C-alpha cells in the first residue's frame, strides 16, 4: 500500500513539473527577468546587447507620467512575474 502511494506521489509531481515546463507559468526575477524581457521585446541577447542611453538620467520630478513607460511598469512586472509565476504572454504584455 505504501509503495502505491509513493509511486502515485512521484507520478503526480512529475506531471506537475512537466506541465509547468511546457509553457505554464514560471517565475522570472532579477537579471533573468531583464534578459528575458530583452529577448522577448527587442530580440537582444546578452552577447549582442549594447548599453543604450546609459548616460540618460531621469530626475524625480514627482510626475511619473513623464518617466519612460518601463520605469512605471517595473513594479507591476515584479509583482506579476517574480513574486508569483507568470506566462510568456504576461511578459509580452509589458513590452
From Swiss-Prot:
Gene this protein is translated from: BBXF1
InterPro entries: Bombyxin, Insulin-like, Insulin-like_sf, Insulin_CS, Insulin_family
Alphabetical list of SMART domains matching this protein: IlGF (SM00078)
Protein name as catalogued: Bombyxin F-1
Subunit (UniProt): Heterodimer of a B chain and an A chain linked by two disulfide bonds.
Signal sequence segment: 1-19
Annotated organism of origin: Bombyx mori
GO molecular function: growth factor activity; hormone activity
Entry keywords, A to Z: Cleavage on pair of basic residues, Disulfide bond, Hormone, Secreted, Signal
Amino acid at each position: 500500500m505504501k509503495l502505491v502511494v509513493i509511486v502515485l506521489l512521484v507520478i503526480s509531481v512529475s506531471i506537475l513539473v512537466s506541465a509547468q515546463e511546457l509553457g505554464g507559468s514560471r517565475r522570472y526575477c532579477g537579471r533573468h527577468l531583464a534578459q528575458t524581457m530583452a529577448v522577448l521585446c527587442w530580440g537582444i541577447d546578452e552577447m549582442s546587447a549594447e548599453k543604450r542611453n546609459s548616460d540618460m538620467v531621469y530626475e524625480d520630478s514627482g510626475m511619473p507620467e513623464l518617466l519612460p513607460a518601463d520605469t512605471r511598469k517595473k513594479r507591476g512586472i515584479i509583482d506579476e512575474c517574480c513574486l508569483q509565476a507568470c506566462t510568456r504572454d504576461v511578459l509580452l504584455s509589458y513590452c
